[in-house]
């Protein structure tokens, strides 16, 4: 198994990043996701929230225009869930489009972002104010 740092390095090498780019970008992303002190650990040595941060870091390390987070808080406690959503918000503020797929209405309602609700494959609401009303089903 690879360490967190090795995982990120592998993701960058896979797309042809130079060693110089890797040396610059990996520490930046580790710091951004709050794992700068845990880069030498293996994912199985980390908590669930930290493992989720590794997944986000791996998605982010090659500086994509967009990341899709499918149920990023699925198995996390409420505090870790909020931390992950705040991290995704920070990533969005830095210029990356973030699409979050979730059933966690209470988490979504804490952020003033666009909310698109889909039911049976159809858009049933598109709210720019970022709030689910009580009638909205997900």
Q: What is the role of each PLM region?
A:
Residues 78-80:
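Helix N-cap at the start of a conserved alpha-helix in ABC-type nucleotide-binding domains
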């Amino acid at each position: 198994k690879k360490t967190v740092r090795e995982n990120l390095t592998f993701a960058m090498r896979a797309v042809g990043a130079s060693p110089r780019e890797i040396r610059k970008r990996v520490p930046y992303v580790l710091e951004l996701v709050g794992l700068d002190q845990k880069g030498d650990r293996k994912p199985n040595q980390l908590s669930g929230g930290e493992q989720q941060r590794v997944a986000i870091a791996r998605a982010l390390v090659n500086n994509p225009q967009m990341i899709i987070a499918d149920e990023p808080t699925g198995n996390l406690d409420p505090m870790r869930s909020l931390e992950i959503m705040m991290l995704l918000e920070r990533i969005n503020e830095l210029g990356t489009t973030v699409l979050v797929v979730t059933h966690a209405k209470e988490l979504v309602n804490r952020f003033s972002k666009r909310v698109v609700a889909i039911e049976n494959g159809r858009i049933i609401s598109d709210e720019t104010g970022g709030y689910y009303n009580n009638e909205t089903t997900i």
